[in-house]
Amino acid sequence: MAGHQPILTVSEVTRHLKRTIEDDPLLQDVWMRGEISNFKHHSRGHMYFTLKDEHAKMSAVMFAGNNRFLNFKPENGMKVIVRGEVNVYEPFGQYQLYALEMQPDGIGNLYLAYEQLKERLEQEGLFKEENKKPLPPVARQIAIVTSPTGAAIRDIASTIKRRFPVAQLTLLPVLVQGEEAPHSIAKAIRQANEVGGFDLLIVGRGGGSIEELWAFNEELVARAIYQSVIPIISAVGHETDYTIADFVADVRAATPTGAAELAVPDLKELISRVNQYTERLKRAQHELLKRQKEHLQRLQKSYAFRYPAQLVKQKELELDQQLERLTKHQRRMVSDAKDRLSQLEYRLKRIHPEGRLRQAEQARVKLEVLLKKEFQQMMERKEQQFQQAISSLNLLSPLRVMERGYALPYKAKTQELIKSVKQVRMNDRLHLRVTDGQLICDVKEIESESGGEGYDQK
């Protein structure tokens, strides 16, 4: 047994190999060429096979989620190019290929170039929908970029002439395969944009092998399509063929005939629609005329047509009423505005010290006026009461009695009113008050009304 060497289990060694392979970026995205053997298509959709060459072989699996996109059926003995990742299947301790894509060998280099260019252009945004231009609703000037001798031009031209004969077609002849084809196609697209006047471009060719269609997978053609200000329909190959040009073009057609159908409307269908719209317009016009005629007849029978002068007078009266209402409304608005202004001024004055002082002074003046008025009224009431009291006193006043010939006797010294002879003595001096003065008298004789003799005069 080795001195200090660690002793590993099979699982530990297998796990170490798995991590080592997973850390190698080359093995996580690798392209491999080989021959298929031991091929088995499982009922669940997965494909199991061995990929081998003259010197080695490797187990491989392609899960159903990936192999459903294959456009061919893998078989034993078929040479293929596979893209995938290498990893270790721990239970068996063996490494194997987990395939993601597969193509028949012979076109492997082209397919690899296709995938790399597609990925790069997609990252640049050449395939984004927001960059695509809408097709014109009716294209009258159409340029066709294709071979002048191929089936594509015949299919496109015959379809457009059948569907929309008024369209003007211009053929821009190009090479559609070979080394010079990409330059020829890109140049024609640029020339069409420089010349101008075209509503639409159709760029394409008929079907063929991937090598024959390869010009439409070149970056030069893709960028010419992307830079075109004229909308472009791509029509390359058959329905199952997809080229880089299809992804960049504004619209992709499955076939050249399909491109022609997308480019122009069907004139017969347009005529049919026009006829339908014409009939609908006629019916609508007839219905409108009918309604207008009925309306006119109602107007002719109306009061306005029969008595126009009265109607004018009535409208003048209504106008006067409206003007009066408007004037009142205007005055009311002005009055309301003045009221609001007064309220604001009042509120402003209330919160302003000068306004408060003036308000207090006004209140004082008002209070003073009120007090004077109240005092005046009180004096008037008191005077009235006094006059009433005087009148009452006058009714009881001795003066009134004296006016009838009576006099009031008073003692001269004490001014005591004499009500009885018993209050007087002989030789007392008396004052007799009459209405217009008084008399000074001396008592010489005293008689009692009882007829008796005078009382003691001492």
From Swiss-Prot:
PANTHER family: EXODEOXYRIBONUCLEASE 7 LARGE SUBUNIT. Bidirectionally degrades single-stranded DNA into large acid-insoluble oligonucleotides, which are then degraded further into small acid-soluble oligonucleotides. Heterooligomer composed of large and small subunits. Signal peptide: none annotated. Belongs to the XseA family. Keywords: Cytoplasm, Exonuclease, Hydrolase, Nuclease. GO terms for biological process: DNA catabolic process. GO terms for cellular component: cytoplasm; exodeoxyribonuclease VII complex. It catalyses: Exonucleolytic cleavage in either 5'- to 3'- or 3'- to 5'-direction to yield nucleoside 5'-phosphates. NCBIfam families: xseA. Its main location: cytoplasm. It comes from Halalkalibacterium halodurans (strain ATCC BAA-125 / DSM 18197 / FERM 7344 / JCM 9153 / C-125) (Bacillus halodurans). It is found in: Cytoplasm. This is Exodeoxyribonuclease 7 large subunit. It holds the Pfam family Exonuc_VII_L. One of its GO terms (molecular function) is exodeoxyribonuclease VII activity. Its EC number is 3.1.11.6.
